[in-house]
Amino acid sequence: SGSIIHSMEANVGYSPDKSQNMVLMGGLK
């Protein structure tokens, strides 16, 4: 899952709100 997390972070542009971004990505999934 590490690669997926990395890809997600790269997609959002390494935003400071990682937790929020993960929640948004999880919702989109």
Swiss-Prot record:
Q: How does it assemble?
A: NDH is composed of at least 16 different subunits, 5 of which are encoded in the nucleus.
Where does the record place it? Plastid, Chloroplast thylakoid membrane
Enzyme Commission number: 7.1.1.-
Q: What is this protein called?
A: NAD(P)H-quinone oxidoreductase subunit 5, chloroplastic
Judged by the first EC level, this protein's enzyme class is translocase
Record has Ligase as a keyword? no
Keyword NAD on this protein?
A: yes
Arranged from A to Z, the UniProt key words for this protein are: Chloroplast, Membrane, NAD, NADP, Plastid, Plastoquinone, Quinone, Thylakoid, Translocase, Transmembrane, Transmembrane helix, Transport
Q: Which family, according to the similarity comment?
A: Belongs to the complex I subunit 5 family.
Give the catalytic activity. Answer: a plastoquinone + NADH + (n+1) H(+)(in) = a plastoquinol + NAD(+) + n H(+)(out); a plastoquinone + NADPH + (n+1) H(+)(in) = a plastoquinol + NADP(+) + n H(+)(out)
Q: Which domain of life is it from?
A: Eukaryota
Q: Tell me, in a sentence or two, what this protein's role is.
A: NDH shuttles electrons from NAD(P)H:plastoquinone, via FMN and iron-sulfur (Fe-S) centers, to quinones in the photosynthetic chain and possibly in a chloroplast respiratory chain. The immediate electron acceptor for the enzyme in this species is believed to be plastoquinone. Couples the redox reaction to proton translocation, and thus conserves the redox energy in a proton gradient.
User: Which terms does the record give in the GO molecular function aspect?
Assistant: quinone binding
Q: Where are the transmembrane segments?
A: 1-15
Topology in membrane: Multi-pass membrane protein
Its cellular-component GO annotations read: chloroplast thylakoid membrane
Main subcellular location: plastid
